[in-house]
C-alpha cells in the first residue's frame, strides 16, 4: 500500500477487494436492468478541498435510504407515540435517528471500500445454514415493511376518496400502482433519484403544514426532545418506544444502503478517493436523515398536541361539530382514551383544522407509501442477488413481495376493521425491531475486519458505540418479549413462540460469536472462523462462495 494518498495501491490492488470468480453457467444482465446498471461519474476537483459539485454527484443514495425512515410504518409509529405519550418519547425519536445514521454510515462504508453490498459479503463469509436463515429474516423484514406500505397507501386512497374507495379496494389498487413506478427506471438514475426527492419534499410540506396549524407547545416539545425521561410511563409507552426504534432503524435498509452507494464511480485503488467518497456519503446521509427526523417530529408533535389524553367522546364531539360530521361515528361514544391510527389521525386533523388538513394528510401518506414501495423493491432485489446470486427483474421481485403482503392485508381489510389494520401496523414495527440484530450484527462484524476493510475498519470508539446500540436493542427486545408472552390468548401459542425463540437465539448467538471474533476475541475462533480473522485469500475465494 502506497503511503501517498493520491496514488493507487501497489500493484493496483483495490481496497477491500474480495472479488470472486463468476458463478458457474452463463452470465447475463438481470432482466429489466437494475439500479446499478448506470454509474454516476464523480467530477475532478481540487484535491482535499470540499466541493459542492462533488457533493451533488454523491447525492442520491442517502435520500433513497432515508425513505425507509418515512414509510407508513414510521408515520403510524409517530402518531401512536404522540397519542400515547405526548411529547415524552421525542428523545427516543432523536436518538433512534442518530443511531440509525451511525448504522447507515457503516453500510455505506462497506459498499464503498469493498465494492460489494452487505448481502454479497454475507454470502462470501457466512456458512450456508446461517446465511440462509439470515436471508429469510431479511426477506421477512421486507415483506413486513411492504405490508405497512400497502396499508398506508390503501388508507390514503380511502381518505382522498371520502370513503368511496373501501380499504380492500385501496389494497388492490396498490397492486397496479406499483408497476407504474417500475417504468421510472427507463428515464435514468438521476431522474429517478430526483423523483424520490420530490416525494420527500411533498411529505415535508404536507406534514409541516399540519405542524404549523396544530401549533404544538414549544416548551414541552423541547423538554421531551432533549430530556431523556418518561415519567409515569408503563408497558404501552414501552411498546411505542420499541416501535419507534423498529420503524426508524429498519433491517433491510442497512442492506439497501450498502448497495446504493455502488452507483457512484469510485476508484477503489486510491485511498484518497475512498476516503473522499466516505466523507461525501456521510454528509449526504446526515442531511437526508435530518430532513426525515423533522418530518417524523412534525407528525409526533402534532398528535402529541391534538390527541394526548383525548377520549373517544371528545373526539366524537369535535368531529360532530365540524364540517366533517359524517366521520364522527368512527369514534365510540365512551370515555376511554382514543386509540388513534393513520386513518383516524387524518380524520381528527380534518375535524380540528378543516377538510384541507385531512386531504393534505392523505397526500403525505400516499407519498410515503409510494416512495417506500420502490425502495423496498430495490432492497428485496439487492438482498436476493447478494445472498442467493439470483438475478430477477424488478417486475418479478415486486410480484413475489406483493404476493406475500397483499393476501393477509386484503383479508383483514375485508373481514375485520381499521382497528385490526392498525394493530397489525404496530406489530410490524415491533417485528422490525426484533429483526434488527440480523442487520446490525453483520454490518458491525464486517466493518470491524481489518483484513477486509484495511485502514477503514472500525476504530475503538465506533466499535463501542455500535456494540452499545446492539446491546440496547437486544435488551429492549428481550424485555418486550418477556412482557408480551403472558398475554398470549391460548397455551398452544407458547410452543410456537418457544420454537421461534430457539431459532432466533441460535442465529443471534452465532452472529454475536463471529462479531466478537472480529472485535478482537480471537480465542473464540476455530479453524472455520479463520476467514473472519484473515479474510478470503484469492485461492480460496471459490471455496468461500460454495462451501457450507
Swiss-Prot record:
**Reactions that this protein is recorded to catalyse:** Zn(2+)(in) + H(+)(out) = Zn(2+)(out) + H(+)(in); Fe(2+)(in) + H(+)(out) = Fe(2+)(out) + H(+)(in); Mn(2+)(in) + H(+)(out) = Mn(2+)(out) + H(+)(in)
Q: Which residues cross the membrane?
A: 56-73, 83-102, 140-160, 165-184, 194-214, 238-256, 285-304, 347-366, 398-415, 427-447, 464-485, 494-513
- Which cysteine pairs are covalently linked by disulfides here? none
Molecular function terms from GO: cadmium ion transmembrane transporter activity; iron ion transmembrane transporter activity; manganese ion transmembrane transporter activity; metal cation:proton antiporter activity
Q: InterPro entries attached here?
A: NRAMP_fam (IPR001046)
What cellular-component terms does GO give this entry? late endosome membrane; lysosomal membrane; phagocytic vesicle membrane; plasma membrane
Q: What range does the record give for the signal peptide?
A: none
Which UniProt keywords are present, listed alphabetically? Endosome, Glycoprotein, Ion transport, Iron, Iron transport, Lysosome, Membrane, Transmembrane, Transmembrane helix, Transport
According to the UniProt topology, which residue ranges lie Extracellular?
A: 74-82, 161-164, 215-237, 305-346, 416-426, 486-493
- Family as reported in the entry's similarity comment: Belongs to the NRAMP family.
Q: Which PANTHER family match?
A: NATURAL RESISTANCE-ASSOCIATED MACROPHAGE PROTEIN 1 (PTHR11706:SF52), SOLUTE CARRIER PROTEIN FAMILY 11 MEMBER (PTHR11706)
Q: NCBIfam families this protein is in? A: nramp, Nramp_1
Q: Which HAMAP family match?
A: NRAMP
Q: What does this protein do?
A: Macrophage-specific antiporter that fluxes metal ions in either direction against a proton gradient. Localized to late endosomal lysosomal membranes, delivers bivalent cations from the cytosol into these acidic compartments where they may directly affect antimicrobial activity. Involved in iron metabolism and host natural resistance to infection with intracellular parasites.
* The protein's name: Natural resistance-associated macrophage protein 1
Whose protein is this, by species? Ovis aries
